[in-house]
């Protein structure tokens, strides 16, 4: 049996599908369906059981779980604007610690979601404490358990892997609201208004030139399954493409994919701007000095574990995502 926490969420539901594609259905899905609409993310999944997150936590504390093959822990509060540190540390740190201790006692592989938010204002995205300066309590809640793992690396009884997700986009993120990916928001904005708005240039970057390491959720699933297949590998690893691309690339991929749906030709960036399909708004004063204009994962440690699969660039991954979303309409 494999446990997937956050199973009705964005990455968790895609992991369940990834396991299903391998023929694995002995899955315990764990989540909080207070937001009942999230059930839609599990409708086409095959699972053995569903547990509410509070019941699951009690079962972990009581040792009342069946024999497990692995725990894929994706459940967390991922709202980077959440200010309630007490809630965040219990939900993101303490629950992770309890699961870790259970898995170590039972010798069960434990893969968990960390975050690139641990780097905060750093300009170097290498898994090293010198680069880790979270700017919010969300990032700190993730860093705190990464630090625990580092202190326990020499005494592990079973695999433990923390994956620092960068800017993930893809199917089944619609419930995340403002925390959904820029690709999701660009797509909905273009469909509603006929154009996409991006920040104008600032801090040495041209209009729409601020860049992120955007990674398709399909590649995130592939990385998780790689570690599931290699239980001898443990540690904290960046989970990005190793490629920074500007927001302009995301917007262009969204607009041109939707234009193709209408039988219209793809346009270069300059033409998209000229036709008013891509517009720039002044960079907000309240974000100046507090905004990451560039992120790019160093994936050397990830690649050193034997993960050799190519990762989608924005043009490929975002186009796939838009076509998937439109096929549902």
UniProtKB/Swiss-Prot annotation:
NADP(+) binds at residues 10-11, 31-32, 38, 53, 74-78, 91, 142, 168, 176. InterPro entries: Epimerase_deHydtase, Heptose_epim, NAD(P)-bd_dom_sf. The keyword 4Fe-4S does not apply. It comes from Bordetella pertussis (strain Tohama I / ATCC BAA-589 / NCTC 13251). Its EC number is 5.1.3.20. It comes from the Bacteria. This is ADP-L-glycero-D-manno-heptose-6-epimerase. Belongs to the NAD(P)-dependent epimerase/dehydratase family. HldD subfamily. HAMAP family: Heptose_epimerase.
């Amino acid at each position: 049996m494999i446990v997937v926490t956050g199973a009705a969420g964005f990455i968790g539901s895609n992991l369940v599908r990834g396991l299903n594609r391998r023929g694995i259905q002995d899955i315990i899905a764990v989540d909080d369906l207070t937001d009942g609409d999230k059930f839609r993310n599990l409708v086409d999944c095959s699972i053995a059981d569903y547990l509410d997150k509070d019941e699951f936590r009690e079962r972990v504390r009581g040792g009342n779980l069946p024999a497990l093959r692995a725990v894929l822990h994706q459940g967390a509060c991922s709202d980077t604007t959440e200010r309630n540190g007490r809630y965040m540390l219990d939900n993101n740190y303490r629950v992770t610690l309890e699961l870790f201790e259970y898995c170590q006692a039972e010798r069960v592989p434990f893969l968990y979601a960390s975050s690139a938010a641990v780097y905060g204002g750093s300009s170097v995205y290498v898994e090293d404490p010198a680069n880790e300066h979270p700017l919010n309590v969300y990032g700190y809640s993730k860093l705190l358990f990464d630090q625990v793992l580092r202190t326990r690396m020499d005494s592990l009884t079973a695999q433990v892997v923390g994956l620092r997700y960068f800017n993930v986009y893809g199917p089944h993120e619609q419930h995340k609201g403002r925390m959904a990916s820029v690709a999701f928001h660009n797509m909905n904005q273009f469909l509603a208004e006929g154009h996409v708005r991006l920040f104008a240039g600032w801090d040495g970057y041209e209009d729409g030139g601020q860049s992120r390491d955007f990674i398709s959720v399909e590649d995130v699933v592939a990385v998780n399954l790689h570690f599931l297949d290699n239980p001898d590998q443990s540690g904290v690893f960046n989970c990005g493409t190793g490629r920074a691309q500007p927001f302009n690339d995301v917007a262009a991929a969204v607009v041109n994919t939707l234009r193709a749906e209408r039988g219209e030709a793809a346009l270069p960036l300059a033409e998209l701007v000229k036709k008013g399909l891509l517009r720039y708004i002044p960079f907000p004063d309240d974000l100046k000095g507090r905004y990451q204009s560039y992120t790019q994962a160093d994936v050397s440690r990830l690649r050193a574990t034997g993960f050799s699969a190519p990762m989608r660039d924005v043009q490929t991954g975002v186009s796939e995502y838009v076509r998937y979303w439109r096929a549902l309409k």
